[in-house]
Amino acid sequence: ENEISKTIAEYTINYKKTHSQTLLPMLDEIVKMTDMNLDTIDAIAVAGGPGSFTGLRIGSATAKGLGLALKKPLIHIPTVDGLAYNLCYTDRIICPIMDARRNQVYTGIYQMDGDKLQVLEAQMAVEIDELAKKLCTYGKPVIFLGDGVPVHKDRLEKELMTDHDIAFAPAHMNQQRAAAVGMLGIQYYKEGKTETAMEHKPDYLRVSQAEREREERLKAEKTHE
C-alpha cells in the first residue's frame, strides 16, 4: 500500500506519423528495452476517450487485443481524467480542455486530495462559455491544460473569467502522458475499476463528423421527399 510507484518506461512522440504507424512498434520497443515478461503485468490501462476517432479506435483495439491474448483486465481511463492527473498535488481546481471544435471542448472538473484524483464533474462535451460559468460557481482558483488552451485562452482571460484566478499548465504538462494514465490506472485498479477486454469500448462522447454528415444528408433527403 505504501510502496512507491516507479515508471519503468514511457514513449512519447508528437509528430507527423499516425497512431497506426507508431503504436505497435513503440510497444514492441518498450517490451524489448525493459526485458518485460508480458505475463507478469496485472492490468492494461488505456485512455478510452474522448479524442480523435481514429486514434481511439486504434488504441482501444490494441488494448483489447493485448487483454484478450494475455487474459488480463483493462482499466478504462477517461482521457480527460488522465490529463488532469498530470497536475497531481496542485491545490487549484483542474480543468482539462480538449478542442472539440464548434466552440465546444471535451472536459471534466477535478481536484486533488494528495495523490488521489477526485472527479467533481465527469467528462463531458460542452460549450466553452457554459464551462466557464460552471467553474465560476466553485469560487476557487482554476488551472487549465490540454490542446484547447491555445484555442480558448484569450477568451477565458479577457472575457469569460476576467474576475477569477486562472492559470495555464506549462507546455511539458499540457498533453496526454502515458505515465499519468498508468499512475491513475493504479488508483482505479485498487478501487476495483476494471473491465474485461470484451467489455471495453472507446467513449467518443459524440458522433463522428462522418456520422454527423450522414445524419444531415438523411434529414435533407427526408425534407425533399
In which residue ranges do the predicted regions lie?
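Conserved hydrophobic/aromatic positions in well-ordered beta-strands
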Residues: 1, 106-110, 203
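DPxDG-like acidic metal-binding loop motif
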Residues: 46-74
